[in-house]
Amino acid sequence: MHHRFTPPMMNCKDTAIQLLSRRDHGQYELKQKLTLKGYASQDIESAMHFCLEHGYLDDLRYAKSQIRQHVGKGHGERRIRQELSLKQVSDSVVENAFAEEPQDWFELAKSVAMKKFNGVKAKEQKEYAKQVRFLQYRGFSFEQIRYALNDKA
């Protein structure tokens, strides 16, 4: 008869460190993951305190990494801010992260539009509206969209 080996459950701190070794997490995201794994809230608080103290958990570093990741996906500033807000990263941390990760949002919007629409300018209002909606969904402002879709751009 074969018995399946089940490894002993790791303690909360080790699990947190293991999660953070794979990629940066925000405080809220890490807390959610540890809660889902069934750890007690006092163990989670203790593990998070340890990770913060030792620099393993850093919301600013996490926010900057999220900005780089989303820019790589062709997302605009508004979309990125919304995603960080959903992950409960504080407004001040988000502001600092954007200050430390400067982007040319106008050129990014233009690049995304060129890639998506193959440089083809909309000939009809309906097509233009479709292009605008796409770029809005991606998180670009109206000024950035106008720049990206401008014939002279």
Swiss-Prot record:
Q: Name one GO biological process term.
A: regulation of DNA repair
Is NAD among the key words of this record?
no
- Tell me the superkingdom of the source: Bacteria
State any GO CC term.
cytoplasm
Which Pfam families has this protein been placed in? RecX_HTH1, RecX_HTH2, RecX_HTH3
Q: Where are the transmembrane segments?
A: none
Q: InterPro entries from the entry?
A: RecX_HTH_1st, RecX_HTH_2nd, RecX_HTH_3rd, Regulatory_RecX, WH-like_DNA-bd_sf
Keywords on this record? Cytoplasm
Q: Where in the cell is it found?
A: Cytoplasm
Keyword Cytoplasm in annotation: yes
Q: Which family does it belong to?
A: Belongs to the RecX family.
* PANTHER family, A to Z: REGULATORY PROTEIN RECX FAMILY PROTEIN
What is the documented function of this protein?
A: Modulates RecA activity.
Q: Can you say what this protein is called?
A: Regulatory protein RecX
Q: Per UniProt, what is the name of the gene that codes for the protein in this document?
A: recX
